[in-house]
């Protein structure tokens, strides 16, 4: 049975231990120590990584009463080894995990909702609650969570007796067999949890609720995405730098960038509408200039948008008995095409057309569209002579 040092001291970064077993399993080795501060995956928190001597530990799991350390090369059983935890990774996970307990405890106290799903990923933490929470309610929960952090409340862990547990009100997402470990955050939360936590709420640093969405599975409720501590700080630094760049680009104050972007979007919509109107007028004018023919029409254009190109084709087919084709692009980059006809089933003709212009595409009997890599001269020669 491995002695679990992480329950004695969640902040233990280094320790010595004796290797009691080492066995190969595929392309990795599994090491068991007589005692360990490496936390195995559990309670929603990933297993620790670090070093046993000079050997890299890339994951840890619990198997029965033993903690399995996964490494890439063997260590002799009986060896006494110096071990190091990847502390930055562990501490960030503890910050996020304890922060999750704070938020879940506040939501449960305030609204009676239960945490029914928790995932600590490599970039964010998500919590699923079985009730709806508005943006205003989540903002209030975030504010209260940060007050709990600022008040430096104690975080206590203990193993209650069966009788004590019977009289204890605590949160738990599932039925637990065997001895239950309790994590209690002073005046905030009492929850069953097997993972290591910070010693006081001040160590959490900060709590940021980043977003929320309706739960996709498992009934009604909300999923929130959050970060705490150093991970939250790193995220805020990126956001702040981006906001500074936006403020400089738009010549706006840092606290007025959203309004500046909204104005830019509004102006852009007006310009898009004006551009679409001009493109439409130009397409109609260009179609008007086309000379009617009994054969095919082939046009090239680099100005019109897709809607206006379609309009140009629709207007041009009225002036020919064959196909009306419009190409947009260049010999260097290739072309996109739209081809229409009143008299030819283009769905059937598409294969022959694509073969002639090194293209690919399809559509309806009246209109096809796609792309091609043939050059301008070859496209013109093929389309003008094309019959089906």
Where would I find each of the regions flagged by the language model?
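A glycine- and charged-residue-rich anion-binding loop/surface
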Residues: 1-388
């Amino acid at each position: 049975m491995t002695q679990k040092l992480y329950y004695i001291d969640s902040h233990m970064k280094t320790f010595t231990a004796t290797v009691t077993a080492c066995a190969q399993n595929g392309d990795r080795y599994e090491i068991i120590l007589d005692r360990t501060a490496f936390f195995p995956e559990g309670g929603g928190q990933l297993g620790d990584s670090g070093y046993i001597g000079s050997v890299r530990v890339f994951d840890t799991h619990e198997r029965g009463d033993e903690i399995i350390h996964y490494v890439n090369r063997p260590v002799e059983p009986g060896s006494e080894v110096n071990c190091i935890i990847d502390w930055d990774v562990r501490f960030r996970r503890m910050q996020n995990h304890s922060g999750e307990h704070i938020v879940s405890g506040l939501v449960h106290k305030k609204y009676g909702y239960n945490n029914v799903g928790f995932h600590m990923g490599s970039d964010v933490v998500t919590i699923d609650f079985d009730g709806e929470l508005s943006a205003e309610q989540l903002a209030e929960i975030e504010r209260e969570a940060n007050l709990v952090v600022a008040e430096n409340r104690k975080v206590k862990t203990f193993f209650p007796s069966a009788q004590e547990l019977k009289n204890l009100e605590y949160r738990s997402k599932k039925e637990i067999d065997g001895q239950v470990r309790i994590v209690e955050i002073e005046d905030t939360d009492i929850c069953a949890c097997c993972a290591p936590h910070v010693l006081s709420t001040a160590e959490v640093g900060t709590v940021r609720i980043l977003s929320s969405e309706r739960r996709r599975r498992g009934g009604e409720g909300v999923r929130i995405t959050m970060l705490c501590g150093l991970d939250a700080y790193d995220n805020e630094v990126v956001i702040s730098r981006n906001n500074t760049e936006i403020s400089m680009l738009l010549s706006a104050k840092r606290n007025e960038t959203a309004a500046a972007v909204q104005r830019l979007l509004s102006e852009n919509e007006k310009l898009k509408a004006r551009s679409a109107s001009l493109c439409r007028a130009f397409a109609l004018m260009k179609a008007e200039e086309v000379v009617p023919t009994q054969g095919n029409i082939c046009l090239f254009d680099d100005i019109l948008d897709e809607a206006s190109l379609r309009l140009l084709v629709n207007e041009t087919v009225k002036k020919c008995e064959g196909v009306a084709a419009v190409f947009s692009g260049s010999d260097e980059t290739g072309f996109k095409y739209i081809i229409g006809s009143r008299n030819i089933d283009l769905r059937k003709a598409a294969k022959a057309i694509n073969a002639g212009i090194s293209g690919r595409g399809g559509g309806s009997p009246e209109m096809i569209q796609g792309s091609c890599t043939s050059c301008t001269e070859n496209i013109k020669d093929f389309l003008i002579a094309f019959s089906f």
